[in-house]
Amino acid sequence: MTPGTVQGRIINAPGLQPLFLIGDDETSRRWLHERGAVLEQMQAVGLVVNVATPERLAVVRSWLPNTLVSPASGDDLSQRLGLNHYPVLITPTAIEQ
């Protein structure tokens, strides 16, 4: 997975907790800065791909300190969700950027 444009689409996943997918890159940092308050309000959980070290993970977590952000396998998420790019928000009704 790489930073890039994600085509939004409607999904049907009742009960899914909102989650967002980011990487350790400037595009993801800006996206979080712009949407952080909304993500916190909806209690979204973050998954981060393409993070090289525990130190870099700590930096990424500092971008949105009041939100749970965990490392994840980009390959697995890409296959399961049909995504090639991030950052992206996934809710019970939509995948959107």
How should each PLM-predicted stretch be described?
Residues T5, D76, A94-Q97:
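Short, surface-exposed patches at the edges or C-terminal ends of soluble domains, predominantly
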Residues L47-V48, V69-P71, P87-I90:
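Short hydrophobic alpha-helical runs that function as membrane-insertion/retention elements
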Residues S62-L64, L68-N84:
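Thioredoxin-like thiol-disulfide oxidoreductase module
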